[in-house]
Amino acid sequence: MVEGGIAKADKTEFTECWRTTWKTPYIMRLALSAGIGGLLFGYDTGVISGALLFIKEDFDEVDKKTWLQSTIVSMAVAGAIVGAAVGGWINDKFGRRMSILIADVLFLIGAIVMAFAPAPWVIIVGRIFVGFGVGMASMTSPLYISEASPARIRGALVSTNGLLITGGQFFSYLINLAFVHTPGTWRWMLGVAGVPAIVQFVLMLSLPESPRWLYRKDRIAESRAILERIYPADEVEAEMEALKLSVEAEKADEAIIGDSFSAKLKGAFGNPVVRRGLAAGITVQVAQQFVGINTVMYYSPSIVQFAGYASNKTAMALSLITSGLNALGSIVSMMFVDRYGRRKLMIISMFGIIACLIILATVFSQAAIHAPKIDAFESRTFAPNATCSAYAPLAAENAPPSRWNCMKCLRSECGFCASGVQPYAPGACVVLSDDMKATCSSRGRTFFKDGCPSKFGFLAIVFLGLYIVVYAPGMGTVPWIVNSEIYPLRYRGLGGGIAAVSNWVSNLIVSESFLSLTHALGSSGTFLLFAGFSTIGLFFIWLLVPETKGLQFEEVEKLLEVGFKPSLLRRREKKGKEVDAA
């Protein structure tokens, strides 16, 4: 049926999906056309990681001000918060198809503005427009696919949206790598997003509106016509009847609680089942962001440079691994989430995340401790005014290399020109400038400004990849699944919307603060901080989030009516009652 129980994407359903879409390619056309919104979502959140490296080269103020770098990245997230919040109203008022078309226009405007930006503030404006589109696409694309898919394969089709998001991120890294040596590098990287937006806009013009939205607007004949193209003739009447009952029930609920946003919000927080559902739903969404995942996706080339790889091209090539692993993890999740359960996958994922973050903190700490020393003679071999001002007094007195190292040099906002003999040998601490970088390179040396040459760099890449491997199948996809199941039917849209906004707000906080945190605490301290946040998140997931695998919506509602308690607390409570009875 169009409305009802949980749509699961199990092995049988995937087989049925291929069989049905082979017989009725129109269904796949609907799903893939709408799914381009997920691809755009992933592309625009991932492309900035590589583009930022070259934006810093073109604009000195961006290179010198970490808050400006953070703002360029996070303004898309700020726009997404608004896009997701307003998107719900646009979806209900103008329809799913129109919402996707509006999102495409916003994507295109943002891409054009960024591609031709003459100054950093114009890039920020473009990122805000892109954010509006991302926010709308994040909620509209899966909604359209769900409402325009046959029930028996809905789970399989909707689950591809998550795969397209991670696929879009992977595609963005490929594009970044492709334009490394092209004049205008970052302008091409950011502008390419306009191409799939145009493609989706054209495709959606020839596709229909969601049959559910049409029925809700009393355009019943149009709704039937679409269902007749999706379902076999002998199933259309049953679908129409299910649609009728669902819409009538929805209207009856609105008559009781009112259809205004404030009335629905009051009804939700006055309902203990919804409150407990929101506690679980918001917990998993906030935890998803505070494990630090989007700092890895947004800043992975920068993190690779923190690990000691100076080349932009090398950094982007290595960070391509993280996005590829993320996409692979989405496929793994689709295979196992209905076999092992949502709660178990998230808890296992969180344990792995915490372990990887602690190891990464240790690796970066050791890299900082064992960073190459600064040699006074090496620093003086350049022009008199080329030595870093903070190190100049030590260079003048010919201080021994043990006094300063590369990491201290970089924290003084200077650059490190590695020894031409061996990159880990003592080098020079010099002024941070393009001229100095060119001078250093002309002598056959490597210039470092974001990280120091390190023997630990390979370990950092390995555990960064392992972090993605343990994140993607659990905390990467399951929070969205939980939020589609945890709320009563009449509050699912509102509850999911509140949880989605909490996700984007958390995303904004983390992405806006990451570079400032690495500047203040170092990479090691920042990863350790995320490990602490992840530990807190693990505790609240264990405490508040029930297992919803295999449960119908009514069963989830009954579970939340009595309140969820972890098995450990239930056993202790039972033991306490037995002692009292004795």
From Swiss-Prot:
It is a multi-pass membrane protein. One of its GO terms (molecular function) is symporter activity. It comes from the Eukaryota. It is found in: Cell membrane. Plasma membrane inositol-proton symporter. Mediates high-affinity myoinositol-proton symport across the plasma membrane. Active with myoinositol, scylloinositol and D-chiroinositol. Low activity with mucoinositol and alloinositol. Belongs to the major facilitator superfamily. Sugar transporter (TC 2.A.1.1) family. Gene3D superfamilies: MFS general substrate transporter like domains. The chain crosses the membrane at residues 35-55, 70-90, 105-125, 128-148, 162-182, 188-208, 290-310, 317-337, 345-365, 456-476, 494-514, 525-545. It comes from Arabidopsis thaliana. Highly expressed in pollen and phloem companion cells. The C-terminal domain (546-582) is required for plasma membrane targeting. Signal peptide: none annotated. The keyword tRNA-binding does not apply. InterPro entries: MFS_dom, MFS_sugar_transport-like, MFS_trans_sf, Myo-inositol_Transporter, Sugar/inositol_transpt, Sugar_transporter_CS. This is Inositol transporter 4. PANTHER family: INOSITOL TRANSPORTER 4, PROTON MYO-INOSITOL COTRANSPORTER. GO terms for cellular component: plasma membrane. Keywords: Cell membrane, Membrane, Symport, Transmembrane, Transmembrane helix, Transport.
